């Protein structure tokens, strides 16, 4: 019984080693594949950025002046020296 367990374990280990050896990729080939994938991604990214630059409206690139303060105007009656109703702006 003990001999059969050892034999079975040896067969399983040998099978795993053979399978891993067959599916293994040499290090040089793996590095070349990674370089090829990186260069393809770089080319795709360059193509996308060029397309984005062409589609960008030039007016969007100009900075616009934002209001430096909030407008505090409101419609009210008998306020801000108004005898009647009107807009009152406080700065």
Curated annotation (Swiss-Prot):
Assigned protein family: Belongs to the hepcidin family.
Pfam family, any one: Hepcidin
Gene that this sequence comes from: hamp1
Residues making up the propeptide: 25-64
Disulfide partners: 73-89, 76-79, 77-85, 80-88
Superkingdom classification of source: Eukaryota
Cleavable signal peptide: 1-24
MF-aspect GO terms: hormone activity; lipopolysaccharide binding; lipoteichoic acid binding; peptidoglycan binding
Protein name as catalogued: Hepcidin-1
PANTHER family: HEPCIDIN
Compartments, as annotated in UniProt: Secreted
GO biological process: antibacterial innate immune response; cellular response to progesterone stimulus; cellular response to steroid hormone stimulus; defense response to bacterium; defense response to Gram-negative bacterium; defense response to Gram-positive bacterium; intracellular iron ion homeostasis; multicellular organismal-level iron ion homeostasis
GO cellular component: extracellular region
Keywords: Antibiotic, Antimicrobial, Cleavage on pair of basic residues, Disulfide bond, Hormone, Secreted, Signal
Function of the molecule: Seems to act as a signaling molecule involved in the maintenance of iron homeostasis. Seems to be required in conjunction with HFE to regulate both intestinal iron absorption and iron storage in macrophages. May also have antimicrobial activity.
InterPro entries in UniProt: Hepcidin
């Amino acid at each position: 019984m003990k001999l059969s367990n050892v034999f079975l374990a040896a067969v399983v280990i040998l099978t795993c080693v053979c399978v891993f050896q067959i599916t293994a990729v040499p290090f040089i080939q793996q590095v070349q594949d990674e370089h090829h994938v990186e260069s393809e991604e770089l080319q795709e990214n360059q193509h996308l950025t060029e397309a984005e630059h062409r589609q960008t409206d030039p007016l969007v690139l100009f900075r616009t002046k934002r209001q430096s303060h909030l407008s505090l105007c409101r419609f009210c009656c008998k306020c801000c020296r108004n005898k009647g109703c009107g807009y009152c702006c406080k700065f």
